[in-house]
Amino acid sequence: GTSVIRVGAGGIMLPNHSPMVIAEQFGTLATLFPNRIDLGLGRAPGTDQRTLQALRRGPESSEYFPQDVLELQALLGTPQENQSIHAIPGEGTNVPLWILGSSLYGAQLAGMLGLPYAFASHFAPQAMAQAVSIYRERFEPSAQLSKPHVMIGCNIIVADTEEDARKLFTSPQQQFTRMVRGTRGKLPPPVDDIESFWSPAEKEQVSSMLTCSFF
């Protein structure tokens, strides 16, 4: 096993969960693996209406995202004298929070709260530069972070040759095309001819979404 690699969540969609439940779950992880857990928080529901109903959540849940982040932060932090609700385990673990986003909203919120910001380039690569700029402009130092800290989520394909890497890349290209079409499924295997899979319009849209890709 490892003893230093940081682990945690690349994305808990907080509107789908109670801050109390997340505090207890990640408090458990932080108790088992002290100082090794990170918690990334997203605002998007990340699912359809039926699944939202099954989770007993509604589309309006995302409106409370800033309040939920602050509540979660308080539950994971040092308990206050008048605090009546406690997450056990969780309380006092101070699990580092990240704000995940692909919009200017997330960038502003992360900056205002003094939290690190992770940008999802595969959703809105065109907004990346502006989002990072706004985050840095709006950043306020906090107990967790003294200066801005940005992470960019991008696609990196590694193989023996660039030709092999580009063939492997046809798997996410197909998957994103399916997403554009509104269909779901497992990650498809690579294909020799991606051009026969998508239409010119789909190619343009998917290629735009996957701009931040490196071989």
Regions found by a protein language model. Give the residues of each.
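A conserved active-site cap/scaffold subdomain adjacent to cofactor or substrate pockets
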Residues: 105-126, 131-132
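Active-site mouth loops of central-metabolism enzymes
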Residues: 11-19, 91-101, 159, 209-215
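Hydrophobic/aromatic residues located in beta-strands of well-ordered beta-sheets
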Residues: 7, 37-39, 97, 117, ...
